[in-house]
Swiss-Prot record:
This is Protein unc-50 homolog. The gene is Unc50. Residues 1-39 are annotated as: Disordered. The lineage of its organism: Eukaryota, Metazoa, Ecdysozoa, Arthropoda, Hexapoda. Its main location: Golgi. PANTHER family: PROTEIN UNC-50 HOMOLOG.
């Protein structure tokens, strides 16, 4: 009996092996995970916590690489998303784990908004209010809405099948930040040099140039957003995002022909918010 018991005991798998078998079978099981199985949720929470913790640790941020990304978002945005794919292979996530890009983007927003406030002749407190609106409303709050929309749509309708991993919300927000930077520089920086002496006038060339800046900015935003989701191999029909491009061009033609200067309208809107 003792020998039999010993043989029986040695043939039983160890608890760690049982746990491994259980985890493996859970991954391939068609049954839904148990209520206490929150691996993905906890992982996302942990990643978000680490990301937010690093926001004030500037010595741990790679600003040189973030500047490289900003440059290539203008000239070759495909190269930026190749790095996102590399991050997925090495760190098992598409979203950035380094907030350097976000920090530099906020700095650019503040600096260009100060220039915009100077051109508009805003007072000190109006300039502070203007910067607050641009950073926290126009960029971050609107970005949260847009990222949540694309996150929900891509996960529900654009995945090749339900077994593929979900698109991370953090990645959707990164796509928004990437797409936001070129329009920011076009509309909040380069356009300022033409506003007072040309774009703000009533001439045809004034509204044509002002509307062209908006056409380029919105075109950049749509195209970079498309690249962000098109680079993910398990998404399908991402070209539907490009439908917005001919619509934007048609709107450009219509508003230019009817005599509407989009830049002047948005400048008046900016003034209305801070007065």
């Amino acid at each position: 009996m003792t020998q039999y018991s010993h043989v029986k005991y040695t043939q039983s798998p160890t608890p760690s092996v049982v746990s491994g078998y259980s985890s493996a079978s859970r991954l391939h099981s068609p049954l839904p995970p148990p209520a206490n199985h929150r691996r993905d949720c906890l992982s996302a929470t942990t990643k978000s916590y680490k990301y937010l913790r690093r926001l004030l640790k500037f010595n741990q941020m790679d600003f040189e690489f973030a500047l490289w990304q900003m440059l290539y978002l203008f000239v070759a945005p495909q190269k930026v998303y190749r790095n996102f794919n590399y991050r997925k292979q090495t760190k098992s996530q598409f979203a950035r784990d380094d907030p350097a890009f976000l920090v530099l983007l906020v700095v650019c927003l503040c600096v260009t908004s100060l220039g915009f406030a100077y051109v508009l002749g805003l007072s000190f407190w109006q300039s502070i209010s203007f910067i607050f609106y641009v950073v926290f409303v126009d960029c971050i709050f609107v970005g949260i809405i847009i990222a949540s929309f694309f996150w929900a749509v891509t996960n529900r309708y654009l995945r090749t099948n339900s077994l593929e991993p979900d698109i991370e919300w953090g990645y959707a927000f990164d796509v928004h930040l990437n797409a936001f930077f070129p329009p920011l520089m076009l509309l909040h920086f380069i356009q300022l040099f033409f506003y007072n002496w040309l774009i703000s006038q009533t001439w045809f060339i004034s509204r044509f140039l002002g509307n062209t800046f908006w056409l380029m900015g919105m075109g950049y935003y749509v195209y970079i957003t498309f690249l962000g989701y098109n680079c993910i191999p398990h998404l399908k029909n991402t070209r539907i995002i490009l439908i917005a491009l001919p619509i934007i061009f048609l709107l450009f033609l219509v508003v230019t022909i009817i005599g509407w200067n989009a830049t002047i309208s948005f400048v008046n809107f900016y003034k209305y918010r801070v007065y």
